[in-house]
Amino acid sequence: MKKNLLSAIFIASSIATMAQIPFPVKIDTSWSSKTIWMPKSPLKQQVLFVGGVDTVQTTATYGNAAGATVAKQWHDFIGFTPETDPAKIATGDLGWVIVNHEMVEKNDKVGDGGGMTTFKLRRVTGNVMEIVPQTLTDGRSGKFFNVDFANTVGETGMNCGGISADNGRIWTAEEWFQSSNTQIAGGVRDTSDFVIGTTTPAGFPGFNGKTIKKYQNLNWMVEVDPKTGKAIRKQYNWGRAGYEGGVLMNDNKTVYLFEDGTPGLLIKFVANTAGDFTSGQLYAHKADAADKWIPIENNLDTLINLKSVAFKRGATMYTRLEWGAVNKTNGKIYITETGNDNPGSAFKSGLGATGTIANHLVLAYKNRYQIVNGTSFPGTDAAASDSVRNGAFKDYYGRVLELDPTTGVVRTFFEGGPYHTASASQGVNSYPNVHFSNPDGLNFAYIKGKTYMIMQEDLNGRTWNRMPAEYQAGTQTICESYLLDMDIANPTYSDLMRITACSPGAEITGGIAIDSRTMLFNVQHPDGANTFPYNNSLTYAISGWDGLTTAVEEYFKSKNNSLFTAYPNPVANELTLNKVSDIAIYDMTGKRVKVYRDVQVVNVSDLTPGAYLIMNADGERVKIIVQ
């Protein structure tokens, strides 16, 4: 994975090694060979929004007049609300983009706690984007607007993931779970009790006038309006937890929520009326229950303490659920479970004492046991479950889960990896070409009849091969985003196609396809020593996917070829061999240009357009044409 990092943001070339490989300096180029076309990528990368640099328009807050200030940093989730006005669509207006800021701080202008920024996006000539100047209903004018939480629903915090529904409705998730006013005092100045319904016109039916501790007004899903730059309501009836994200189903009634915790919850809410999420029934997932879900009553005390209530009733325990998305092709939900290097006693004591161990974690532990010990786990599934409960499963890489909403069954879709048997990572020269770890962001792209899963990493660490041995400093961390062709049966990490990566020291997140042409991504908390603007959190677009479909399809198809061949990844300017090989690259005069040892992925971004021959140590050849 990290061996050849090539992306629209960060490019690291592979290292050519000339020693100990018996390739002649000159060859006869008249031999016939298979021709591989390396098309010029039609993709265009464009930075749209830079934290700490771009200016956001603010509302009157804490006695300060409305005005402007620099945007917050730590960009995370991206939501998108499509434009529906035909006249605006005809001028290129795409819709409203809204970005979470996971940074928590006291701020006189944008409000304390976390935050969000909203802006409108337009596509102009080709795939060039521009930010649309707007005047909002509250009179603010400009390009970027702070979302007002402080004057509407009370301060928010830890804005991490969220829900970006197909119908344009947006919820932001307040992830980092808070247990006292002392915990929040560093980022929220007013820790006095909060009365529900005092700052929003509609409040929340059934809970208006209820008094709660200030910290208890954090860790909810919060609906926001990107068009007005204001929060609408905290979703008290969905329960209070360390939510990372969720999905709204096509029935416009059913919501699934994912908690980033060890143990973490999988929650479902079903509205009584489509589109009205102020009334309905809440459930927690319990895999061993007959109907897979246990009901949670709509009582404020219960909802505030959802985690302890659900686990006391035997809810299934997950290892840090992150983002999820509905695959509109098959109707199933896919959820990232990022893993935990050292769960310790989290599944055994406290909240975990009465929760149920997830079946897929038992299976993952048994598979790991087989790899490490060379023999099957000797005990029963119950014994393996006890091992997981006792903290024996060090979940270094995480996985992607599949939830079937018709049955309530959760299974592993594919595991991260490959597993490395030592804490010390391999060096670059022996590092695997694909190493997928700690999945976080997840979404889907639908391009010319094909369905692709978009995934992003947020590494929990750099050991255990999550970064090569030479790149173990925090400022050297590189997280990547991948595509997976959903037509592949029983996929593994080896089926992934790298599409972009973040600048050093950051995580890549927010990935969303706003249509068949453009994907948006965020880079969060990069190393401050990076070149501007990549030393800031930022939002960027990669456009032109509709012109790349054939090349992407060929990439996935060619990976199963048993003969010596190569297949292009024009997204990342990489040429991937179908097996690890020693190779030499020759120009069409027969002159040796490059030699590589033990490689499977070759950087071709520095080759001038033209024809070349690739020869392996067995003398097998393929011809590539770089456009």
Specify the residue positions occupied by each region the protein language model found.
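C-terminal outer-membrane/trafficking sorting elements
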Residues: A8, Y555-Y567, V571-Q627
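Sequence/structural signature of beta-propeller domains
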Residues: Q20-T549
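Intrinsically disordered/low-complexity terminal segments and short unstructured peptides
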Residues: A16, A353-G355, F521, T549, ...
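Bacterial Sec-dependent N-terminal signal peptides
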Residues: M1-Q20, L613
